[in-house]
């Protein structure tokens, strides 16, 4: 039998470029003109794909084997890459192909880009994304917030206007039931609050805890917002459906802000309102050791003699919870109160 004729290794063609994305490039090499593979793998031609390092201008191997296709992954968008094919014969002889240059594509617009534009207050990018029609305007981020919620919370009034003009739903809620109006009220962004109200946001919406926008505004402590809300028709003694607390009760429990309490009381808030457990704002302020608020509530007519549904009054609460300053204040106030004449 005649020995197999050894075909000299010719310089291969550069890899053929297949599918290109923003993070991958497909390369394959044409073997149609070569003899069909026969015998054990060690007698086949071996292929290597090498990628150029643009800084060092040398090449590194990113694939080696007997396949005729390779997908290069983990690439950067809109970046030029240079590759060459190395073909090695069983005898160790090798040849390099000419270099092929390929650029990855632009990264497709996603909801992440959309939310990133809102987060950093990038008006131009937001407009480009919306004009391109690549994303739904109400798509939530990973925390369940729509773009409008984020813009409202951060006080980005221009972005709020852009999003509303592009059809966003002002009454959508996040996972805890808060809408954009509640978030803007809590953060104190009056311009955003006014604009949301103008475009259909409701004072009557409640979160999962039963709180309204005024409850959240009271927590936030921004008096200009609270003042405008009340003038716009907010019910000053609106009760949450969880604890039965009014905004004044929230102040007594959370911040102890005298300014917010004064504003609510001046607007007609009931200083002796009771929650589901029979507690008054004064009792809650005592329990939370808000000394100055206790003083204010007493000055505004809070009744220090009432008991909750368990028969406990503010003096007993102050003693049990060791609220010494508040206790002194209450006892001093009690001394000054006129004694009631006994009725026979």
Curated annotation (Swiss-Prot):
Renumbered ranges of ANK repeats: 109-139, 143-172, 176-205, 209-238, 243-273, 277-306
Intracellular or extracellular location(s): Nucleus; Cytoplasm, Cytosol; Cytoplasm, Cytoskeleton, Cilium basal body; Cell projection, Cilium
Domain Fibronectin type-III: 11-108
Post-translational modification: Polyubiquitinated. Polyubiquitination leads to proteasomal degradation.
Any Pfam family: Ank_2
Predominant place of localization: nucleus
GO biological process, one term: negative regulation of apoptotic process
Protein function: Through the activation of JUN and AP-1-mediated transcription, may regulate apoptosis.
Domain remark from Swiss-Prot or TrEMBL: The fibronectin type-III domain mediates interaction with COPS5 and RYBP.
Quaternary structure note: Interacts with COPS5; regulates the phosphorylation of JUN and the transcriptional activity of AP-1. Interacts with RYBP; may prevent the ubiquitin-mediated proteasomal degradation of FANK1.
Name listed for the protein in its UniProt record: Fibronectin type 3 and ankyrin repeat domains 1 protein
Lineage of the organism: Eukaryota, Metazoa, Chordata, Craniata, Vertebrata
Gene for this chain: Fank1
